[in-house]
Amino acid sequence: MKQTVYTASPESQQIHVWSLNHEGTLTLVQVVDVPGQVQPMVVSPDKRYLYVGVRPEFRVLAYRIAPDDGALTFAAESALPGSPTHISTDHHGRFVFVGSYNAGNVSVTRLQDGLPVELVDVVEGLDGCHSANITPDNRTLWVPALKQDRICLFTLSDDGHLVAQEPAEVNTVEGAGPRHMVFHPNRQYAYCVNELNSSVDVWQLKNPHGEIECVQTLDMMPADFSDTRWAADIHITPDGRHLYACDRTASLITVFSVSEDGSVLSVEGFQPTEVQPRGFNIDNSGKYLIAAGQKSHHIAVYEITGTQGLLTEKGRYAVGQGPMWVVVNAY
């Protein structure tokens, strides 16, 4: 299995393309100059394209991924209705979802042969919209509205329109600020990192009464932390055993173990990392974690070790200015 790591640096308008080997070493393959401040990125389900959101001219760009080394070639672009904060796709590669924090909306762009071709739908009124997350069954889009302490729930129609479900939302505690999400591989639970109080919520997608329920909320900060809380990103290993979340003020990654059924998180430790970690990701083998320091202008590679999933640094690498996003592609 070959793996490629992509890092987005908006201040220098660059994407760095890295080859990741089995020992956790990165080798630079390419530096792409992007026509705009590149921020969120996602790889298409068929692993042939990288979709990126740029500003100040709000667009989604599609890059073809070379099958031999992961290098990028520009392929197409499509306009967006707001500054892109988060980008994702449905599992069949038919639609791109973009959440916009500043515009307070989520948009759906149709893909044709892997390329963005037209805007299909826009839902407004999502104050502080910070991500769009499709459920494993490809039916429901979870959209956190950070400033409203709610996660809105939409059914994805066959033609790409978003239809509010009943109930249309679930709510966090006041002042939590739901931000990014991941789903457990067993499809029974979702985990949401809350930016403003640096906590993680565990959501059961269907409890015994057929309802969505928050079954656990866990503080992700050390007991003696007293500064401003500013959580950012969250990811889970492919086997569902370990979950990680980062805080930018403390410049740390919190390590969680996940119970076998996915319902309970336990804090296992805290890993100091690059300054102001805005984004990170986990490789497809579940062996390595790559974190980006927005203020250090470096990325760090960690090996995920032992039954607790603690992190051991393998190396750090200079990237562009203000790196914010990391994605990994395996082929």
Curated annotation (Swiss-Prot):
Keywords tagged on the record: Carbohydrate metabolism, Glucose metabolism, Hydrolase
GO biological process terms, semicolon-separated: glucose metabolic process; pentose-phosphate shunt, oxidative branch
Catalytic activity: 6-phospho-D-glucono-1,5-lactone + H2O = 6-phospho-D-gluconate + H(+)
Gene3D superfamilies in the record: YVTN repeat-like/Quinoprotein amine dehydrogenase (2.130.10.10)
E.C. number: 3.1.1.31
Pathway it works in: Carbohydrate degradation; pentose phosphate pathway; D-ribulose 5-phosphate from D-glucose 6-phosphate (oxidative stage): step 2/3
Domain of life assignment: Bacteria
InterPro entries, alphabetized: 6-phosphogluconolactonase_YbhE, Cycloisomerase_2, Lactonase_7-beta_prop, N2O_reductase_N, WD40/YVTN_repeat-like_dom_sf
EC class: hydrolase
Keyword Hydrolase: yes
GO molecular function: 6-phosphogluconolactonase activity
GO CC, one annotated term: cytosol
PANTHER family linked: 6-PHOSPHOGLUCONOLACTONASE, 6-PHOSPHOGLUCONOLACTONASE-RELATED
Family the entry assigns: Belongs to the cycloisomerase 2 family.
Protein purpose: Catalyzes the hydrolysis of 6-phosphogluconolactone to 6-phosphogluconate.
Entry protein name: 6-phosphogluconolactonase
Source organism of this protein record: Salmonella heidelberg (strain SL476)
Lineage: Bacteria, Pseudomonadati, Pseudomonadota, Gammaproteobacteria, Enterobacterales
